[in-house]
């Protein structure tokens, strides 16, 4: 990942003894995160996944490549396979090297080509931090981001935008990017303030993860605020009339988490449900159970009766 200027966080603790050096935020901020992870590229060299598996890590964001073909990250396939074998949740990021939305679509298509249908637990992030990307102004930067993210979403993945706190504050129209998750880089001892909630926070570029450090001895470390620890339907039971629609609503905990949700119906011939939105359509008289599952694996059920 492109390195941005930042100041080193002072507090430092050792977790899992010598395996990981994590540079934590304040006690209040640290207590708020729901996952500890890191990001990887070819700059980290060949990863020792046996060592990484012993560390207290939940997820990893892996670079697919930069720009358009043929600039694939030479370690992508090995890193993906290694992360899966180590039991880590996996997301990816692709580096933006363009200045137009048309080119951004081409980058998204190249990213998808590299992914080649691989399953992901975390989003596909668009790494937007090169100055040329912002040369056309806020509106142009926004349409570049939207073009990439829409293409990723259309392929069934969760889109995300990565950049520094200052760029995220100044260079995007977030009203037009409501479906994009956010990954912020801010090397500070407090969680950065943004116009939108950050789903991932890269809080240091000078952490240490045994088995995955660069030749300079460092590894980017990341907090996740995405994962839900609980989920429930606001209405555990619902009665509908045939040929009507309703919206299934849920509440996830802790407050502020942005985990993804997936809805299914036990009997779609009676009640169909939109997998992503939870919109219900009553088709004929009968009963069905609607299930919602978070990305972290939490589940809840709702009973629906159609009359």
Please provide the spans of the model-predicted regions.
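Glycine-rich, charge-decorated loop segments at or immediately adjacent to ligand/cofactor-binding or catalytic sites
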Residues: 103-106, 167-177
């Amino acid at each position: 990942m492109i390195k941005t200027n930042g100041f080193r966080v002072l507090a430092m603790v050792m977790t899992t003894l010598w395996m990981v050096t994590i540079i934590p935020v304040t006690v209040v901020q640290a207590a708020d995160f729901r996952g500890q992870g890191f990001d990887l590229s070819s700059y980290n060299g060949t990863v020792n996944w046996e060592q990484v598996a012993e560390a207290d890590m939940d997820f990893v964001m892996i670079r697919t490549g930069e720009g358009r073909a043929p600039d694939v990250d030479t370690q992508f396939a090995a890193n993906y396979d290694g992360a899966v074998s180590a039991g880590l949740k996996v997301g990816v990021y692709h580096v933006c090297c363009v200045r137009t939305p048309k080119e951004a679509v081409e980058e998204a298509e190249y990213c998808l080509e590299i992914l080649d249908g691989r399953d992901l637990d975390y989003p596909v992030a668009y790494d937007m931090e090169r100055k040329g990307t912002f040369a056309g102004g806020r509106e142009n930067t926004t349409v570049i981001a939207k073009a990439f993210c829409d293409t990723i979403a259309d392929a069934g993945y969760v889109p995300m935008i990565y950049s520094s706190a200052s760029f995220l504050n100044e260079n995007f129209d977030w009203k037009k990017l409501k479906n994009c998750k956010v990954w912020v880089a801010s090397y500070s001892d407090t969680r950065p303030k943004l116009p939108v909630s950050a789903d991932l926070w890269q809080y240091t570029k000078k952490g240490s993860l045994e088995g995955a450090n660069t030749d300079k001895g460092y590894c980017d470390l990341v907090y996740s605020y995405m994962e839900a620890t609980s989920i429930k339907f606001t209405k555990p039971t619902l009665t509908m009339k045939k040929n009507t629609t309703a919206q299934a609503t849920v509440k996830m905990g802790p407050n502020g988490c942005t985990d993804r949700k997936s809805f299914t119906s036990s009997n779609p011939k009676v009640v169909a449900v939109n997998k992503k939105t939870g919109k219900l359509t009553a088709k004929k008289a009968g009963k069905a159970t609607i299930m919602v599952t978070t990305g972290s694996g939490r589940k809840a059920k709702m009973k629906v009766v159609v009359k």
